[in-house]
Swiss-Prot record:
Organism name: Bos taurus
Chief location: Golgi
Tissue-wise expression: Primarily expressed in mucus-secreting tissues.
Annotated disulfide bonds: C73-C230, C164-C384, C185-C212, C393-C425
InterPro entries for this protein: Glyco_trans_14 (IPR003406)
Membrane topology: Single-pass type II membrane protein
Pfam family membership, one: Branch
Pathway: Protein modification; protein glycosylation
Catalytic activity: a 3-O-[beta-D-galactosyl-(1->3)-N-acetyl-alpha-D-galactosaminyl]-L-seryl-[protein] + UDP-N-acetyl-alpha-D-glucosamine = 3-O-{beta-D-galactosyl-(1->3)-[N-acetyl-beta-D-glucosaminyl-(1->6)]-N-acetyl-alpha-D-galactosaminyl}-L-seryl-[protein] + UDP + H(+); a 3-O-[beta-D-galactosyl-(1->3)-N-acetyl-alpha-D-galactosaminyl]-L-threonyl-[protein] + UDP-N-acetyl-alpha-D-glucosamine = a 3-O-{beta-D-galactosyl-(1->3)-[N-acetyl-beta-D-glucosaminyl-(1->6)]-N-acetyl-alpha-D-galactosaminyl}-L-threonyl-[protein] + UDP + H(+); a beta-D-Gal-(1->4)-beta-D-GlcNAc-(1->3)-beta-D-Gal-(1->4)-beta-D-GlcNAc derivative + UDP-N-acetyl-alpha-D-glucosamine = a beta-D-Gal-(1->4)-beta-D-GlcNAc-(1->3)-[beta-D-GlcNAc-(1->6)]-beta-D-Gal-(1->4)-N-acetyl-beta-D-glucosaminyl derivative + UDP + H(+); 3-O-[N-acetyl-beta-D-glucosaminyl-(1->3)-N-acetyl-alpha-D-galactosaminyl]-L-seryl-[protein] + UDP-N-acetyl-alpha-D-glucosamine = 3-O-[N-acetyl-beta-D-glucosaminyl-(1->3)-[N-acetyl-beta-D-glucosaminyl-(1->6)]-N-acetyl-alpha-D-galactosaminyl]-L-seryl-[protein] + UDP + H(+)
Lumenal side: 31-440
Post-translational modification remark: N-glycosylated.
Protein name: Beta-1,3-galactosyl-O-glycosyl-glycoprotein beta-1,6-N-acetylglucosaminyltransferase 3
Length: 440
């Protein structure tokens, strides 16, 4: 097996990491030699020679994530209305709905990590040198629905990347144990060293990401960009596509950052206090520090390593962080404001020409109920084919064609209890594209 070059690069760092890494690679090498009978170096997605094609065929056979037979995912991803209607009708038949995997299921299957990774079809080696040379970091904040977490991890997983998982302190103990069991099977996935109770719309959501930022910067993995996720996210690009998109940013960040409406300005006009939920007080806040104009966006970011370092280390950034702690939903204006701060690496100027909407940024694709409508009449997107939660679309199969036409790296929201067909088709699409480099 000719894995020497990328093996050395992947396994450098702390000796315990290296030991575990080499053991993992040894298992991969053995499996490839015995089962696939082809060399990792031949898995070049740009090569058209027979050997590479044969390897991809065998690899796909072993790692394919097919949707159930009654669903035509190829048609759904192309927007074929007959295929979409069939999937939506199928989703309405309660008797066909599979119950999600439980905490106990994962606690049992992860007793044998190799069996778990093989049965759940995780990709356990880099698919290209370009991906190997451009590791990505993830901050994954979760609190419930263990299967959602495991499927998200599987979809974004690559052995050269690094993943920090923050679990809400308030989550049930069995959920926490199941998360620990899953991540214990991977040397590059770890639990955040500091866990906090996450309260909706409060500072704690930001603190969870900050805790992961600190841990990720201490990792020996030389990651280039950080992406943050929640339990209802799912990627709509392969790891290779993400690497290409991040390289094109050329050190810039990508996140929503716009002028706030008068309604949103109220989020930082008065102080909020937190108990089991957020409470508005009558105490007015001082203006933002350093005469910094405030901008608004969302909780999601695509941030360069240098940006993350300045979030944690720059005194001006720290002053803004302290100031937003008692505001409403600070994650929706902290990152957006730092993205316009002149001292932040990869930021953009205050000027209105640099305003960035959620549709322009690549961080997250979201359908807001208030913006849905007739595209021919100027609406940004068609109505949701799933259901709405807090005015956000939980996607259905009818949304997938539109989703895949966009440039974003991830989309929100998905919930297999609402529509598992759209997730199954997205999984099948991404796995096929990751291995073959082409669509279904």
């Amino acid at each position: 097996m000719k894995m020497t070059g990328w093996k050395k690069k992947l396994c450098r760092g702390h000796h315990l990491w290296a030991l575990g890494c080499y053991m993992l690679l040894a298992v991969v090498a053995l499996r490839l030699s015995l089962r696939l009978k082809c060399d990792v170096d031949s898995l070049d997605l740009e090569s058209r020679d027979f050997q590479s094609q044969r390897c991809r065929d065998v690899l796909y056979k072993n790692l394919k994530l097919p949707a159930k037979r009654s669903i035509n995912c190829s048609g759904i991803t192309r927007g074929d209305q007959e295929a979409v209607v069939q999937a939506l009708l199928d989703n309405l038949e309660v008797k066909k709905k599979r119950l999600p995997f439980t905490d106990t299921y994962y606690l049992n299957i992860t007793r044998d990590c190799e069996q778990f990774k093989a049965q759940r079809k995780f990709i356990q080696f880099p698919l290209s040198k370009e991906e190997l040379d451009f590791p990505i970091a993830y901050s994954m904040v979760v609190h419930e629905k263990i299967e959602n977490f495991e499927r998200l991890l599987r979809a974004v997983y690559a052995p050269q990347n690094i993943y920090c998982v923050h679990v809400d302190v308030k989550s049930p103990e069995t959920f926490k144990e199941a998360v620990k069991a899953i991540i214990s099977c991977f040397p590059n996935v770890f639990m955040a060293s500091k866990l906090v109770p996450v309260v909706y719309a409060s500072w704690s959501r930001v603190q969870a990401d900050l805790n992961c930022m600190e841990d990720l910067l201490q990792s020996s993995v030389p990651w280039k960009y950080l992406l943050n996720t929640c339990g209802t996210d799912f990627p709509i690009k392969t790891n290779a596509e993400m690497v290409l998109a991040l390289k094109m940013l050329n050190g810039k960040n990508s996140m929503e950052s716009e002028i706030p409406s008068e309604y949103k300005k109220n989020r930082w006009k008065y102080r909020y206090e937190v108990t089991d939920r957020l409470y508005l007080t009558s105490k007015m806040k001082d203006p933002p520090p350093d005469n910094l104009p405030m901008f608004t966006g969302n909780a999601y970011f695509v941030a360069s390593r240098a940006f993350v370092q300045h979030v944690l280390e720059n005194p001006k950034s720290q002053r803004l962080i302290e100031w937003v702690k008692d505001t409403y939903s600070p994650d929706e204006h902290l990152w957006a404001t730092l993205q316009r701060a002149p001292w932040m690496p990869g930021s953009v100027p205050y000027h209105p020409k640099y305003h960035i909407s959620d549709m322009t940024a690549i961080a997250r694709l979201v359908k807001w109920q208030g913006h849905e409508g007739d595209v021919s009449m100027g609406a940004p997107y068609a109505p949701c084919s799933g259901i709405h939660q807090r005015a956000i679309c939980i996607y259905g199969a009818g949304d997938l064609h539109w989703i895949l036409q966009n440039h974003h790296l991830l989309a929100n929201k998905f919930d297999p209890r609402v529509d598992d067909n759209v997730l199954q088709c997205l999984e099948e699409y991404l796995r096929h594209k990751a291995i073959y480099g082409t669509e279904l």
